[in-house]
Amino acid sequence: MIGRLYMKKLKNLFLFLSSLCPVFPWISQISLVMPFGLYYGFLTALPIGPSQILSIRTFFLEGNRSGIICILGSMMGQFVILLSIYCSPLYVMLVKPHLMTLLVIPYMFYYWYRTKNPSRYYILHPIKSLTHAHTRNLLLDSFIFQLLNPILLPNPVLTRLLNLFLFRYSSNVFFLTSSLLGWLCGHILFINSIKLLLFRIEHDSPIIYILMKRSISRTFSILISITFFLYLGRSPVPLITKKFADEITLSDQKIKENLWEESLWLYRPWPTSFFDQYRWNRPIRYIPNSKSSHNGFVKKQVSKFFYDECITDGKNAISFASQPSLSIFKKQLMNYLHNSDISISTKDSYKGWIETKREKRDALNNEFKDRIQFVYNSSTIEEAMENKTGFSHDRNHFLVKVNDPFLSGSSRIRIPNKKYSSSLLKLHDSKDQTMKISKKTKRKHTRNKMRNWIFNKHKKWQHNKFPLPWEPIPTKAEKVFWRILNESENPIILEMLTTLNSIKEKNYQFRITWEHIFQLPRIEKAIFLFRSKQEIEDSIFRYPSHLSLKNLTLFNIFTRSKNIFYSAKIAVSPILQIEEMQKELPRYNSRLRSDRIDAVNVDVDIRQRKIKNLGPRKGKLEDKEKEKEKAAQTQTEVKKEREKEKEERVIKRFQNQSDFRRKLVKGSIRARRRKTGIWRLYQSGTHSPFFLRMKEIPISFQSSINALRLNKMKDERAILGIGKELRPFNLYKKRSKADRLTIAARFDFPIAHAGRGVLLIIQSNIRKYVILPILIICKNIGRIMLFQSPEWKEDWAEWNQEIHIKCTYDGIEVSHRHLPAHWFKEGLQIKILYPFHLKPWHIHRTNNINDLRNEAQIQKEISDFGKQRKLSFSYLTIWGYQTSSVFGSMKKRPSFWRPIANALKKKLQRNLFSKLTWISHFFYEIILLSRTFIISKKPNNIPEMSIQSNELRYDVSDYELIQKYPNSNEKNDYVVMNEISIESNNRNGKEISHESQDQYKDNFNNIRSFNDIETLLTDISGTSVEESYRDRIETYLRLNKKNHRYAINIRLIWNKQLVQTQQEFSRFRRIIMQFMHKGYRLAKRFLTKFYREIFRRFTFSIQLSIQLVLRLTKNITKLSEKNKVYQNLNLLKKNEQNLKIDSSRNKPVLSQAYVFQKLWHARTRTKIDVHYLVQSLEREIVNSIENNELKASKLKDLKWNEHNYLNDHIKDLLEIQGLLKETQTFTEKNWKEWLHCFTRYQISSKIEYGIVPQKWKNEVKKRWKSNTNKLDKNKEYKTLEKENKYSLYETNNMLKQRINNRNNYCEFYNLLYSFIDSTKASNIIKLPIQQKGKEDPIQYINDINKIHENIHLNSKKKYKRPQFQSISTEKGDIDSNLMLWLLPNLLDTKPESVTNSLDSYSFEMYLSQNEDKDSLKKEIRFNAKKLNLDTKEPTSDAMKPTSDTKELISDTNEPTSDIKSDDQSENQNKPLKEKSIRERKHHRPIPQVKWKSKSVEKKMQRINNLTSFLSVIEDRKNMENYIISFCMKMGIDIDLLNSFFTNTEDELSIQLLDDSAHRLPRLLNDQTLVRKMVSILLNFEKQFEEGITSKISSQSISSIYRTEKKYSVNSYNLEDIMLSRRYRELRILNSLILEKQYVNFDHWIDKSEKYPFLNLPSQVQIIKRFLWPTYRLEDLACMNRFWFNTNNGSRFAMLKLRMYCPD
């Protein structure tokens, strides 16, 4: 609401300012432009990109000065980008960065490496000087970051809008100043906001800010690198995309693969060797209209034109390239102005602009009139034409038009040097130049005999190189020729084959000549040349055997580089030759292989749904592992294993994620999408996350209170213990499993799989082959140093037992040798079986087992050890750790040092502490005696004791055990008792019986609850205290003696161990001394050898240098002597060259290269064979009918009628141009007559007089008698010269001149894409002006001139041309029947009936098929009608709607009846061709649906959540329980869920969805476009071939002719008078004027003059006006390059279109 109010206020402000325009004129210019400039300039600083992040980082780390420098660098980068709009080279360098694309990623790595560890100096002491190197680096970094923004990173929309407005309003000073002001204000606001943020961080941070800077720098370096990689992921570089192989091959030949094709990529020019311009980078996603459509994924022709009214030449017209947004804005503006009270007069606001444009237009019109009037004042058109200035070397040598910057202008481009073969490179000059050269050679022929001899030798050399047309071809080439004729199916070639076979049967010595090869069509001719030159290529590749890539060593490259490059050029040139001679057609036209269903392992060209590998079947994998664990396998077992491997199948499934690359062509980058998210199962529209927050429903205050109450109730229940029983037992396990699944889903995308898989493989190899071997070696070396036996065998055995098994991403095992398929995209896991753990020592188990241990317990321990051994595995992580499951928690590693520490503790306890126990024993005995003495004083209280000698075995060791286990419970009693028994057994040296052991157990059970000796003695019952006291004393004395002996033994053992350690230490010292002595000797010996080798090499190098110096001096002296000799030779050669003739001036008059190029384009048929075209169409439709197996009875109803196929206007045009006539071929007679046209093959009069003098005299007399009167009138003679033709489009027909000028490719390219302009050619025939020139009648002298007369008479008989009627000036409009000749009634009807006329004249073909097959071979003739050019009859019979057109009009006006007719047609089984045409005429709606209600949408959202939960669960067995529990908790409608499984798809769509389909505008009929394209090429060929025949006949005249004062009429273009740029400006000014004022040229043309026939220049004029019409995309000329890529079918066709042919 706030935004709407703001926009309303802004609109009112604009309207108020516009109302003040009459009062203040300057407000009219500022009112609309200034706010837009401020707004868009201010918004350029808001988008946050890498350059802004860099500036924020410098503010935080280095202070205000460095931050401002960084922002200045980014501003400089923005300013350079804005300047690129006005500077084209700068724009090309920034937008087409082939080199910068390769340098961006290394630069980013360099920047990241440089800033990851900042120095403390910059943090603690910010730099204050501007001349420091760090400031320059900072400025350069920010500048480069800003330049990279429009290249690789997605440029913000706001910045692009500013660029667009700057380009549009570049001439408006107010907009430029306001945008600059807004731009500066935005940056100032940005700087102040950063300073405010810095102030808050410094004052609010709990840590000292200087210490905090290091973490800030680390964070920003990571952030910048992440943003770069994210942007690169969204807009990837097209270097790594999949490339399609070029499948353009000839019709009947598969070209042999070139072995050097891959190795010769270095010889191709930059950047085609690294970039492929034909790759599909951003194709359009194909959406079929219906399920039953079988069209290809790439349409042949796509119409994206938007038709709207426009003003052209001061009148309304229909434009096909108008902007939809402009028309919508126009309607809204008109509605607003109509409803508003303020009346804005456009005439007043645009009055000044209109006046200036009108004055300019009038000036151009007046200049145009003056030039035309000058032509009518008996002047030639050459004098009236506007000239251009160009460069020249001297008076006679001019620059080529393409290379001249003055003449080519903006169309001048850099032309690469193409590689031609020798036969095409050495073409001769034009005929004018050859005539001049021949004259010069004739003059010099008699002067110098030496030059004459050189000329004859040169002539023989050319004869050997260029054979004549009647000479036979080689035998190998003849075999190729016959093979091509036998393989081809072209009817022209079949006729040619029959004629040649008949000639060969009559004459056995018949040979194929070059004349027969020139009669072949273009494709077959190219095949012949390619196959004949293929033998040369093979010989080139076979001859230099040393040129293979394996044998190309460094020495060969430098020594034989000339041969290599020469053979490489020869290998490349023939391939490029064929490509240049033939036009490449657009590729990928419905040739893509696709599958309607997403299937597994299908080779298609369209991307399908992503598939994920789950791995092979488990049962077969286990069998395979068991077989691999066997040590020895026989050959039969190996065969069985291989068979099982073949039988294994990989389980695959589709991924659950959405795939936006689906249904796109492979090798293409996915389309750019905005930042939209998909969060529902069925979502009709996407929304940006920024605007998605507006749709969030705010939580009310009452709902929050209820939530707090619920939480409080839960806490109370938890305190009371309610609900504890409802908690599941394995809650922790489920949560951990859910966590693992979420982590796996988070990393389940191709980029993460690629990086993670590579790291896992690296970690696996490092662990297996680097870390573990190093640990094993270090451990055993340590054991050797500690004088222990090494354990190499045990450690390497355990290391070999560790197996790394490669698994899929889900954890399914595949193999320990091979990686799973598509692991780089689908993920990888590595499972470690029997992981190796380094142990300090290995326990060697003996066979002696203690008898006291139970056998069952031993077996249990062994089985437990086996189970533990069998289940020992873990999963490897990218950091090298081990986990118990996939993405589980880390597994604890067993410590290496803990067993060593425990062993040291035990050893200390056993050896040191046990040996020092005699001290404790002594104090213990003292305490015992003292206590017994105290007890003896109380005899009355203690009963007597009767203790046997064998019962009281209480020893010091027993007391130690009690002290060792003072608080032992019942579980440890048995262990303690066992230790007591074992120690007593060792002490006495005898085995203890089971009875004594039981007694000890009973006694210990009685005394274990007492804490001291007092309690122990009070429980003993005996007879008397005295006996007990006596026995105690005896035992004490006996034990005291033993302890004394034991202490002496301890001392001796201790001394003995000390002596042993000293001996071992001395032995170690002796070994070290020996090693040092030997090492000293070895080092001394090595140093002496080293010094000797250095001395020897140094002396040898000195000797070599001396020898080289001596040799150089000798060579220098020899070179000086040879130089003098060469100077003398050069003087001799210069003198010889003065005597020779220049080879360029001594070329013959007619070379074979000219004949070759002339006949290459001289087709076998001089006219277009319409009969053959119609017959081919007829055959195609008949074949389609036969494939559908229609009955012959139904075919009889379909009748072929020529009126149904072609319109009257088309037939008239075809009859005028002679297209309905039969084709003609060159005969031997024609060749002989043609050869007489050239002076080289013409016999001189002297020789002819000497051979047949009488015949020659008779012929000369006849000619002189017939021309005596004419000779008396005019006695002026002229030599034979070429006629001057002043039309710029009437260029020389010699194709060798076009090849020399390198324009052949460009002109054919323009012809193919200029058919779009033809829809605007409303006036074609009546525009040419008539020029009265003097006609020069030819006075024939020679006999050969009869040929010209016969040809002239035959051409008059064949082409009956209608009389040309002059254009009247009574009406302002100019009528024409050729205008829009495919849609002739478009401009004569009203605007309301335009659509009906378009439909009424759409082509429908009704072909018939008779039962007899001979009827297909009949010729289809058209009844030609005369052209009705009278302006008083605007309508004719041809323009009246027939019955068929009425039906079509009724069909378009009644869509319901059309649907019925479609149903009836299906029932009646009409042909498929008619059905497809009817479907194209009636466009179908696009299927689109929406939910019926919001409740249904909520239910489906719940089902969506259910599916997302179920997709994570792996337990498929208990899936039903999960579904029921989720449905109960989430409130899902079970009936609706069941309907997905019970109902069909149509029933669900009726139940849940509503239809919201809408129709699109009608597509442009592709048949009209195809026909126009074909007609353009055919008309051009016809004009070209007729031009050849006329010029050949005119050049055959070798006599002198005389002129008479007689006027003839030739038609020229109006545009030829003025330059193309000025005439284009005139057209644009006429279209921009809003009033209906246009230039009427009718009164400039003489209406009284009529013409007897339509001559050849007028036919050329029709073709020229059809190919280059007068309306030449004026609306596109006014627009900028930002709009060029909108309204075209192939996205780049408009950019390739040349609006004007090169001048």
Curated annotation (Swiss-Prot):
Residues 615-643, 1431-1494 are annotated as: Disordered. Residues 618-660 form a coiled coil. It is found in: Plastid, Chloroplast inner membrane. It holds the Pfam family Ycf1. It is a multi-pass membrane protein. Residues 619-643 have a biased composition (Basic and acidic residues). The keyword Protein biosynthesis does not apply. One of its GO terms (biological process) is protein transport. Its main location: plastid. Belongs to the TIC214 family. Involved in protein precursor import into chloroplasts. May be part of an intermediate translocation complex acting as a protein-conducting channel at the inner envelope. Part of the Tic complex. This is Protein TIC 214.
